[in-house]
Amino acid sequence: MGFAADVPPAEVQIAGAILAAPPELREGAAVLGFGAQGTRVELRTGKNEMICLASDPAKATFESDCYHKDLEPFMARGRELLAQKVTGSKRNEVRNKEVEEGKIPMAREPRTLYVLTGSRFEAATGKVQDSYLRWVIYVPFATTQTTGLPTRDRKSVV
């Protein structure tokens, strides 16, 4: 990474990034992508509550993420930790602790993250090859008592 040729033009990054968002929210979504040096930059200012992240051109596969703007402090901290090579459960532990300590603001209401993955983005067609869309619904400060959801996955209790 680091060469301008490695980074797709802003319009291509935007077209791919917004595909993770619900169709009715795509046009007004803010988009964070990559500049010529491979650093994260704002490609488009948002007009609604969605923020979308363009796929990292340094990675072999495609992934775009879109989420409610109230999740941005939490997501930005996750990107900072990844840059520091803090990954997996350790990254989640750090962020969750910082939320509990009030260091990272977190929405009080549920918010959704949309993640679209695939083998590649075809700029000419605007389609993601071998695509898969998943949702993550963040329910901050929820407990088993407030949601009825277990604290462990089913495999660990069956």
PLM regions: where:
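N-terminal secretory signal peptides
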Residues: 3-93
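Pocket-edge structural micro-motifs
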Residues: 33-35, 54, 116-118, 139-141
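Short, surface-exposed ligand- or partner-binding patches at beta-edge/loop junctions that are enriched
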Residues: 152
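Mature extracytoplasmic domains of secretory-pathway proteins
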Residues: 61, 69-134
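Conserved small/polar residues in nucleotide/adenosyl-binding loops
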Residues: 157
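Substrate-binding/catalytic groove segments of enzymes
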Residues: 144-148
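Extracellular structured ligand-interaction cores
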Residues: 47-49, 132-136
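Helix N-cap / beta->alpha transition motif
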Residues: 67-68, 138-140
